[in-house]
Amino acid sequence: MTDQNMKILTVDDFSTMRRIIRNMLRQLGYTNIVEAEDGAEALSLLQREKVDFVISDWNMPNMSGLDLLKAIRADEHLKPTPFLLVTAEALKENVVEAVKAGVNNYVVKPFTAETLKGKIDAIFKE
């Protein structure tokens, strides 16, 4: 069972997508949710606040989700942070690149709250 009180950071340049993910998380019982518009803003927030889990879009301006993942894995303090990458295409090359960068799991848009729950449960069973 995952900690319903864990702090979750959702990162997406599209505010509607952040709202959709936030609503899904609330539906699943998670209420401690913070948001960022891109990887650069997310990284800044991660360096200031303790976050237990990151859900990030892949394609964003300023800093992509993949670049955010690489920055997190390169930082000794942030390195252990579980990371779920959200992508529009499940291209094999992209998945391989994300796995090499240290992603815990990924989900392809569009997805349901049930799919999100399955991904979160799988990450926290690792």
Predicted regions and their residues:
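Alpha4 helix (beta4-alpha4-beta5 surface) of REC/receiver domains from two-component response regulators
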Residues: 22, 67, 90-105
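Active-site beta3 strand of CheY-like receiver
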Residues: 49-55
